[in-house]
């Protein structure tokens, strides 16, 4: 299980804190054995306090090549606050890694539950999604493949250019009337 993000962005702190305090206990209750890799820059004092409640957490720190860590991993995006497109999801998709996220985590990217990813908003549902995904390698491959296909369809540069030009044409036509 892998999380990508640094401590200097508060939504990442909240996400890792929520996973360690709320989701990890749900995983343990189910007898699920895991390692929670956190990629990014974090202060050791904060990491130690989280490891006290989540000994499965391992700080990887900064890495040059995310694909090396993400490929074959289940990426966790337990984001509950913030806005904007989640680069960690784009990193997962480009690495062909399946991922579990929250509704907030996938906000801004038109990916669908059970089609391109698993979406869960409560700690128990998030843990269940992690366990489900870990147990089903075919599901991992299907979600990763579908996510890449969907993003290529949605964000095709040529189609985006054509949509932008259509908007410009409409604006120009409205201004001339």
Give the residues covered by each predicted segment.
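Conserved catalytic-core segment of nucleotide-activated headgroup transferases in glycan assembly
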Residues: 1-71
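A charged, aromatic-enriched C-terminal amphipathic alpha-helix characteristic of glycosyltransferases
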Residues: 138-169
């Amino acid at each position: 299980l892998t999380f990508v993000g640094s401590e200097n962005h508060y939504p990442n702190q909240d996400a890792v804190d929520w996973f360690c305090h709320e989701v990890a206990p749900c995983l343990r209750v189910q007898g699920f054995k895991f390692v929670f890799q956190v990629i990014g820059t974090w202060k050791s004092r904060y990491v130690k306090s989280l490891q006290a409640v989540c000994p499965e957490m391992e700080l990887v720190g900064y890495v040059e090549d995310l694909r090396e860590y993400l490929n074959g991993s289940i990426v966790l995006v337990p984001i509950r606050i913030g806005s904007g497109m989640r680069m960690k999801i784009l990193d997962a998709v480009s690495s062909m890694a399946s991922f579990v996220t929250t509704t907030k985590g996938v906000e801004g990217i038109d990916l669908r539950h059970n089609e391109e990813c698993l979406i869960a908003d409560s700690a128990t549902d998030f843990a269940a999604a992690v366990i489900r995904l870990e147990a089903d390698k075919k599901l991992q491959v299907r979600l990763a493949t579908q996510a890449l296909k969907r993003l290529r369809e949605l964000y095709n540069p040529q189609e985006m250019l054509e949509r932008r030009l259509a908007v410009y044409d409409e604006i120009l036509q409205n201004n001339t009337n």
